[in-house]
Amino acid sequence: MQKTEPKSANRTALVLFLAAASIVTSAVLYLGSAQTISSHPKETHLRNIRQLTHGGTNAEAYFSADGKKLIFQSTRDSYKCDQIFSMNSDGSNLQLVSTGKGRTTCAYYTPDGKRVIYASTHLGSPDCPPAADRSAGYAWAIYKTFDIFSAKPDGTDMKRLTSTVGYDAEATISPDGKKIIFTSTRDGDIDLYEMNIDGSSPRRLTNDLGYDGGAFYSQDGQWIVWRANRPKTADEVKTYKDLLARDLVMPSKMEIMIMKTDGSQRKQLTSNGAANFAPYFLPNGKQIVFSSDMNNKAQGIPNFDLYLINRDGSGLQQISFDEGFDAFPMFSPDGKKLVWAASRHGAKEGDIDIFIADWAE
């Protein structure tokens, strides 16, 4: 899963929220409270919007199974690259989960709430890894030092789950708590893999040339949704392979994909040539919420909004209408609340905060 940059006339749209984490005992940093904000009049699905974080770059907030906690990644205060934090779903009791070493990304609770998983570069170096080389255009860095770890929610009892050479990150957990789906370069391309919750028995799920990542299970465990880039022309294939050799990938064109967990019924849901990413199943299993810049009208100024689409690819509808960045949506387990990251109401340019709203059908 990734980091993204908000509205800026001299920046492109997405930044990989790739991060690294090592874990020790977490520390309580801040006792916050949610702040109710106004919304765009067209945002009829979003009621009672509250801002949960205030300042810094915050994203990929995911609920615990009981809906009481959120775990997310943040660059803030003295931390120069993303670290993992948790907080109550009202924004209170903010706690550092990772140690502040390296870069972290994509944290997720186990269904029983007893452990969390996330990816970290801290074994490669305690320092933040270098920024992506963008001399050839806007790109995400696919850090080879990323591995996936498991820990208790307070950051203790850290266990390494992957140890192959190359990028292992973007991990989420199946509803029964038995499997982890993740993205890896272990076989030479950027593909989806599934492994047991303890890191054993990994198996490859995708094998088409191109990036596959950011996968989530449906709540019934029958489906997987993810984002993918498929280079088609000779020039696109060459560019993709050249960037991959430098541990980079361009995210400007990605489409939303689904398949059954056994690999059958694979289907591409979007075909708009935009940057479609961060898909997540609604609890009903019939719809998917995701972020896209498909309606971006201003050149060079990223404008990402939230959208709904049916599992068969029909019924596309826009959910958010605020200018700037709206992404990384996730529903609470009961489907009553939506949490996401946005640049709206930022204290300064570059801020991305976590927001929560009551969901209205």
Residue map of PLM features:
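Hydrophobic beta-strand positions that form the internal "hydrophobic ladder"
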Residues: 70-71, 116, 180-181, 224, ...
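Residue-level detector of Asp-centered blade-edge/turn motifs that repeat once per structural unit
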Residues: 65-66, 111-112, 175-176, 219-220, ...
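A flexible loop/linker signature enriched in serine peptidases of the S9 family
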Residues: 54-57, 74-84, 99-104, 119-147, ...
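Blade/loop signatures of beta-propeller domains
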Residues: 32-47, 146
